Amino acid sequence: MFPMVTGFMNYGQQTVRAARYIGQGFVITLSHANRLPVTIQYPYEKLIASERFRGRIHFEFDKCIACEVCVRVCPIDLPVVDWKLETDIRKKRLLNYSIDFGICIFCGNCVEYCPTNCLSMTEEYELSTYDRHELNYNQISLGRLPMSVVDDYTIRTILN
């Protein structure tokens, strides 16, 4: 055939192919138009953390027997356990317990292997601060339970 006619045929096929691709993209775009928005207005809306969420560690001072299992299973030897041996009863007495959340990787090994269950993970994840030294929590600050997102009336909770 003539080169001009074949050029017009190729041009027509390319035009049809381009229109089909544009139509497919438009169909995909329209399929997303009727979905609900997924944006969360963070300070005023929060997602409820799942049951297995690994947030800040909660520590119960009275249950701890200063066995230091948490230190041994921690991949970075993070918890600092200070204890004193009571010679009359031949038991360890816990003096101080602290965790630096600036270094903690929230692996959960300390919680999993604690024999007395004095450690547990909370749903608190808002640990940001301007000074990294404020992330070093002692037994008093570790013992405070965080305010539950569900109980906070100023925040609208959103289920996953």
Curated annotation (Swiss-Prot):
What is this enzyme's EC?
7.1.1.-
How would you classify this enzyme at the top EC level? translocase
Q: Where are the transmembrane segments?
A: none
Q: Which InterPro entries has this protein been placed in?
A: 4Fe4S_Fe-S-bd, 4Fe4S_Fe_S_CS, NADH_quinone_OxRdtase_chainI, NDHI
User: Where, by residue number, does [4Fe-4S] cluster 1 bind?
Assistant: C64, C67, C70, C114
**Keywords of this entry:** 4Fe-4S, Chloroplast, Iron, Iron-sulfur, Membrane, Metal-binding, NAD, NADP, Plastid, Plastoquinone, Quinone, Repeat, Thylakoid, Translocase
Membrane topology of this protein: Peripheral membrane protein
Cofactor(s) needed, names only, are: [4Fe-4S] cluster
Location in or out of the cell? Plastid, Chloroplast thylakoid membrane
Task: Tell me which residues bind [4Fe-4S] cluster 2.
Answer: C74, C104, C107, C110
Answer whether the UniProt record assigns the keyword Ion transport to this protein.
no
Where is coiled-coil annotated?
none
Which GO molecular function annotation, any one, does this entry have? Answer: 4 iron, 4 sulfur cluster binding
Q: Which domain of life is it from?
A: Eukaryota
Instruction: Name a Pfam family for this protein.
Output: Fer4
Tell me which residues make up the 4Fe-4S ferredoxin-type domain.
55-84, 95-124
Q: Quick one: where is this thing mainly located?
A: plastid
Give the GO cellular component terms, alphabetically.
Answer: chloroplast thylakoid membrane
Catalysed reaction equations from the record: a plastoquinone + NADH + (n+1) H(+)(in) = a plastoquinol + NAD(+) + n H(+)(out); a plastoquinone + NADPH + (n+1) H(+)(in) = a plastoquinol + NADP(+) + n H(+)(out)
Q: Which GO terms describe its biological process?
A: photosynthesis, light reaction
Family under the similarity heading: Belongs to the complex I 23 kDa subunit family.
State its role: NDH shuttles electrons from NAD(P)H:plastoquinone, via FMN and iron-sulfur (Fe-S) centers, to quinones in the photosynthetic chain and possibly in a chloroplast respiratory chain. The immediate electron acceptor for the enzyme in this species is believed to be plastoquinone. Couples the redox reaction to proton translocation, and thus conserves the redox energy in a proton gradient.
Q: What is this protein called?
A: NAD(P)H-quinone oxidoreductase subunit I, chloroplastic
Organism (species):
Cucumis sativus (Cucumber)
